[in-house]
């Protein structure tokens, strides 16, 4: 199972939010490239980068910082989400060196967009499903839809996406532990890999997710835990990927 460090960008800084609240942020660094280097040196094979400003504004805002990370680490797999609403934006990111582009809000608002994107950019499209209280949230998590996460996941899995990133918003940035039962239920319901996100606090929780690798959980994203030191990324990565 791949362990993936998260870099969340807001105003050019690397931050962590609590439960996706833009006003409840902690700044960990003002240098995204140096932050990426830190995780590369710790053995990261992939980075999860979110343009938080982009997610709220509906268009890429921190693309320059993301392009700089791509340029600095051409061999690193980078997956990017936040504010991606058009094929032109997807193309710009891929040309900059991004490996996977994550579609969230637009997947919910315009379901045909995902199918079209997988045709235009085969091998590059992931879908982010962000849930709160059993429903899918959009617009930087500010709006709750009526969609059931599993129903949505099954629909997009049929479109030929590379993976689904499943986030439990109530756990995100809280170090309260991932929602393993909901993540496993979703992974078992779809034939594509699922990457777990939200709530990881320690090594025990990483290994609890790894125990469900056979159910389709192929990766886990960690943010606050590795920045605050409750999880040693290098040690956890070695065990997760063993």
Swiss-Prot record:
Gene3D superfamilies: Aldolase class I. It catalyses: 1-(5-phospho-beta-D-ribosyl)-5-[(5-phospho-beta-D-ribosylamino)methylideneamino]imidazole-4-carboxamide = 5-[(5-phospho-1-deoxy-D-ribulos-1-ylimino)methylamino]-1-(5-phospho-beta-D-ribosyl)imidazole-4-carboxamide. It comes from the Bacteria. Pathway: Amino-acid biosynthesis; L-histidine biosynthesis; L-histidine from 5-phospho-alpha-D-ribose 1-diphosphate: step 4/9. One of its GO terms (biological process) is L-tryptophan biosynthetic process. It is an enzyme of class 5 (isomerase). The keyword Isomerase applies. Keywords: Amino-acid biosynthesis, Cytoplasm, Histidine biosynthesis, Isomerase. InterPro entries: Aldolase_TIM (IPR013785), His_biosynth (IPR006062), HisA_bact_arch (IPR006063), Isoase_HisA-like (IPR044524), Isoase_HisA-like_bact (IPR023016), RibuloseP-bd_barrel (IPR011060). Its EC number is 5.3.1.16. SUPFAM superfamilies: Ribulose-phoshate binding barrel. GO terms for cellular component: cytoplasm. It is found in: Cytoplasm. GO terms for molecular function: 1-(5-phosphoribosyl)-5-[(5-phosphoribosylamino)methylideneamino]imidazole-4-carboxamide isomerase activity. The active site is at 8 (proton acceptor), 130 (proton donor). The keyword Amino-acid biosynthesis applies. Pfam families: His_biosynth. PANTHER family: 1-(5-PHOSPHORIBOSYL)-5-[(5-PHOSPHORIBOSYLAMINO)METHYLIDENEAMINO] IMIDAZOLE-4-CARBOXAMIDE ISOMERASE. NCBIfam families: 1-(5-phosphoribosyl)-5-[(5-phosphoribosylamino)methylideneamino]imidazole-4-carboxamide isomerase. Belongs to the HisA/HisF family. This is 1-(5-phosphoribosyl)-5-[(5-phosphoribosylamino)methylideneamino] imidazole-4-carboxamide isomerase. It comes from Acidithiobacillus ferrooxidans (strain ATCC 23270 / DSM 14882 / CIP 104768 / NCIMB 8455).
């Amino acid at each position: 199972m791949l362990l993936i460090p998260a870099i969340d960008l807001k105003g050019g800084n690397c931050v962590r939010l609590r439960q996706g609240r833009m006003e409840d942020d902690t700044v960990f660094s003002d240098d995204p490239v140096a932050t990426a280097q830190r995780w590369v040196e710790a053995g990261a094979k992939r980075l999860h980068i979110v343009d938080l400003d982009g997610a709220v504004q509906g268009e890429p805002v921190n693309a320059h910082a993301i392009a700089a990370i791509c340029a600095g680490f051409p061999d690193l797999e980078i997956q990017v989400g936040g504010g991606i609403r058009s094929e032109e934006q997807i193309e710009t990111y891929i040309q900059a060196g991004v490996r996977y582009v994550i579609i969230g809000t637009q997947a919910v608002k315009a379901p045909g967009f995902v199918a079209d994107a997988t045709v235009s950019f085969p091998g590059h499209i992931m879908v982010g499903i962000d849930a709160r209280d059993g429903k899918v949230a959009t617009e930087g998590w500010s709006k709750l839809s009526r969609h059931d996460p599993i129903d949505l996941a099954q629909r997009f899995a049929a479109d030929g996406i590379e993976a689904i990133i499943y986030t439990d918003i109530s756990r995100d940035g809280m170090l309260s532990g991932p929602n393993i039962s909901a993540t496993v239920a979703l992974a078992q319901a779809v034939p594509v890999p699922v990457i777990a996100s939200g709530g990881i606090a320690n090594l025990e929780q990483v290994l609890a997710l790894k125990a469900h690798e056979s159910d389709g959980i192929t990766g886990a994203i960690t943010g606050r835990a590795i920045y605050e030191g409750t999880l040693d990324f290098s040690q956890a990565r070695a065990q997760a990927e063993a």
